[in-house]
């Protein structure tokens, strides 16, 4: 789906793959725009729940979300509801599983006709890996697998994910991970933690006859074409800015809680500190904290930035501008155990801005190390005293116009492609 992190992770690699002489044939859902640079086939999933999801997004992209959209999607939902219930009762998998079926059949045709030498599954949605597994078993084609998020969700630091889950979708993902280790030629993850726990569950990884596993840092293309950081201009406000989605497990409420403590010591800070949320609605915990603390003027929700008709700047250009104007960029990691295996994609975009990052992280030494080596403010989820101390340091640094100046060491997508091509040749 265009604009989503899972989509950008692969689409940003395409120019570098083309430059390396690779001729891709892309299979995807119908929820994005068809690429015209190469053969790009878009398939509707065959299962009822995924069909409903894909149809909604396709119709909205084609005709908007007006009255026709409401009528058509309502009719589709009514017609498919008994089949969706049956699908959940019989299988219990996440809705997108059935996309694997058309992808497998079309892939099989291309492989047998000699048009495909390598299958590269990436996700995101695990249906791509399922289709690739079927193709590997049917044809023996070379298979490369890129895993974005952990296939197996652990519950604690002691849990390595070998227990059989009660949830059927989780059981299938556990099975699929084993199959990938057994049958794929190369598998890579985006964090050291993800590779570590996958190896714990699958000791045969990186042994003869099984998948070669390694880590690729996905990086990001310079947002808005940024090539270098711009000198920062301090204003009368300390602007802390967060970009991206929010949820109760990834909430700005933890910063508002720290702000309450700061204001007891520095009451004048309330007039100077502004927290900006771009790109998503506020989570319920943040809304509750705003009401409780009277922070309506402190935390400002801007939502998604669209094209400005007055300046002509696109939404993306406005986002880049706001990132660069921020005194400090907020990186919320979350509080689930799987954060040990996950690095927010926004981190790589932040690196291009040259602005200091305040990372509030959880059980991820890999992410902590990358933040520290570049120069950042760092706190740990659950360490309330540490979060309060970090906010106070930011406040005092800003007052003295001495905020951390991070090292300019961004990661582009080109390095990820070089790593993949080197490991898999």
Model-derived regions, located:
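Conserved donor-binding/catalytic core segment of Leloir-type glycosyltransferases
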Residues: 232-250, 256-259, 421
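Nucleotide-sugar-dependent
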Residues: 250, 306-324, 329-348, 358-369
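Nucleotide-activated donor-binding/catalytic signature segment of Leloir-type glycosyltransferases, i.e.
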Residues: 277-280, 284-320
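A conserved catalytic-core segment of Leloir-type glycosyltransferases
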Residues: 26-98
